[in-house]
Amino acid sequence: MSVSAFNRRWAAVILEALTRHGVRHVCIAPGSRSTPLTLAAAENPAFIHHTHFDERGLGHLALGLAKVSQQPVAVIVTSGTAVANLYPALIEAGLTGEKLILLTADRPPELIDCGANQAIRQAGMFASHPSQTLSLPRPTQDIPARWLVSTIDNALAMLHAGALHINCPFAEPLYGDMNDTGLVWQQRLGDWWQDEKPWLREARRLASDKQRDWFFWRQKRGVVVAGRMSAEEGKKVAQWAQTLGWPLIGDVLSQTGQPLPCADLWLGNAKAVTELQQAQIVVQLGSSLTGKRLLQWQATCEPEEYWVIDNIEGRLDPAHHRGRRLVAKIADWLEMHPAEKRKPWCVEIPRLAELAWQRVVAQRDTFGEAQLAHRIRDYLPEQGQLFVGNSLVVRLIDALSQLPAGYPVYSNRGASGIDGLLSTAAGVQRASAKSTLAIVGDLSALYDLNALALLRQVSAPFVLIVVNNNGGQIFSLLPTPQSKRERFYLMPQNVHFDHAAAMFNLRYHRPENWEELESALAGAWRTPATTVIELVVNDTDGAQTLQQLLAQVSHL
């Protein structure tokens, strides 16, 4: 019997089973123990293959692919700490709902806890963060192929959102020519190999029922809070709220067009909060809210009912309101709960939103971080997409900009870390093949710098704007100790990104005014290549501008 040949047949069943559940993208890191999985993926024509030398970046690349494709994405890595590097992406997927299938090669049981090289305790290493876990046995013909394929099918049928970790031990030898070993074992699956359906099909219904009293609540004074959702859902939510006459507070990731812009500014005004207190019901569609003032209002508002609708299961209301948690796709829920045409009941909030917007517009000519956030909609590529980083930049865009309704916006706002942002943006671009604008801070770019390797070959123009404010300036918004702030919080690195771009043969610009930025962008959108644009700004100007605007709007 050839161990290497049977390893490959075992792996081929696993990979083929994944295709029956919509997996098309497979992300592969180099490794020896993962050879059976890698070769099975490489030989399966149903897959689009992506490779990267860094497993942490690979996991985030898969995350970006899953965000856009809305399908599960497989990741193949070798044993040892390679597996541990998938942890950040796995955690993010668990919080934002993207489906990742993590195929982690492992040493066989007899090599664990005995001093063998590159052998760690992988089974269960991700604790409660995967939505599903599956620890497979060592490949053996004593276990029928139908057990293996039905086990994979069952795990994927149970995967509503988040990650499935499949740990796959393989014994040596890992290399060798294919022979007839295990061929009969494999052929017992019959015409399944020519079919396109899972071996085991399980129906799982998660959608909430229609709320029978909706006809009553839609006649009340309501507020719509829009969190993370798709572009198509964002447009529908905006129209739904407008018909109801309810104010819509749209997050930067809502893609609703934010009809009441600068919510993070006007929610700091007591008049707005007083008017919102009249709401009898709040309907929150989508999770992962960004704005600090929005979260503060959400934590203190006390409507008669607070409904949260999202496709992800679990509790998504950190303020623990009395109300309803409804699991459903947002578009489906809106269809089941149509709006009734009513006059808007809010008067003060639209006025405050307009005044706040005027205050922001008055400062747009200054070359700076806050002004870039406000102007970002002017720089979006036609029929393209936006990827927004974390920390200060996403808060500035949320507070100061008004993105077009239905324009695709992506971000990692689950755990909201700054790790893997460039890799995620690369996955977003690869899955869509659209022109992409990504904007991150300097520390975020440094954190994921080797992801520039993923941006060397792109299918459409990709612009990466690095806002270099020399450190983690979000801490300037927090009451961190002044004497300790620079060394222990901001951590300025005093670097520029021209050499990093050159290392990966990427185009690079460092504009010093809006005209130079617009010229660089105009050239970038004409070529299917990556352009790095570094905006060097005064360290604390972005945070200070936001604080000044908050103070101004609070006194309107």
Curated annotation (Swiss-Prot):
Judging by the UniProt lineage, the source's domain of life is: Bacteria
- Stated EC number for the protein is 2.2.1.9
Q: Which UniProt keywords apply?
A: Magnesium, Manganese, Menaquinone biosynthesis, Metal-binding, Thiamine pyrophosphate, Transferase
Catalytic activity annotation: isochorismate + 2-oxoglutarate + H(+) = 5-enolpyruvoyl-6-hydroxy-2-succinyl-cyclohex-3-ene-1-carboxylate + CO2
| Matches recorded under InterPro entries | MenaQ_synth_MenD (IPR004433), MenD_middle (IPR032264), THDP-binding (IPR029061), Thiamin_PyroP_enz_TPP-bd_dom (IPR012001), TPP_enzyme_TPP-bd (IPR011766)
Q: How is the cofactor bound?
A: Binds 1 thiamine pyrophosphate per subunit.
Read off the Pfam families from this record: TPP_enzyme_C, TPP_enzyme_M_2, TPP_enzyme_N
| Pathway connected to this protein | Quinol/quinone metabolism; 1,4-dihydroxy-2-naphthoate biosynthesis; 1,4-dihydroxy-2-naphthoate from chorismate: step 2/7; Quinol/quinone metabolism; menaquinone biosynthesis
Q: Tell me the GO molecular function terms.
A: 2-succinyl-5-enolpyruvyl-6-hydroxy-3-cyclohexene-1-carboxylic-acid synthase activity; magnesium ion binding; manganese ion binding; thiamine pyrophosphate binding
The protein's name is: 2-succinyl-5-enolpyruvyl-6-hydroxy-3-cyclohexene-1-carboxylate synthase
